[in-house]
């Protein structure tokens, strides 16, 4: 009886671990049909993480998808591995804080978005990190 309980717990843990890890797919295995992203040859809209890579093998981009649309954090990288940009998406639209970086890693700009339109504070920076400009946006 004790062995059955232990076996049940192990099976439960393995199932839970497989559910909690998002599916990761290379962008070369993807296709877009009618604005929805799918793994080639599959009929269900993709949920998970799509990644693309530079020819040198370094990560170029990674984006979270839910039901075939960008949802959550998306990042793009320079070929040297430094972060180029990051932003949050909801149903394929930028929402929340978006950041763009210079290749040296310093912040280039910060924008806030609502439904893919600038909304709120914008800050632009020189490559040395000094503030260049600041503005407020309403409805894009």
Regions found by a protein language model. Name each.
Residues 1-8:
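Bacterial N-terminal signal peptides that target proteins for export
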Residues 10-12:
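Acidic, gly/ser/pro-rich intrinsically disordered tails
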Residues 14-140:
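Glycine/tyrosine- and acidic-biased, solvent-exposed loop/turn segments at the edges of beta-strands
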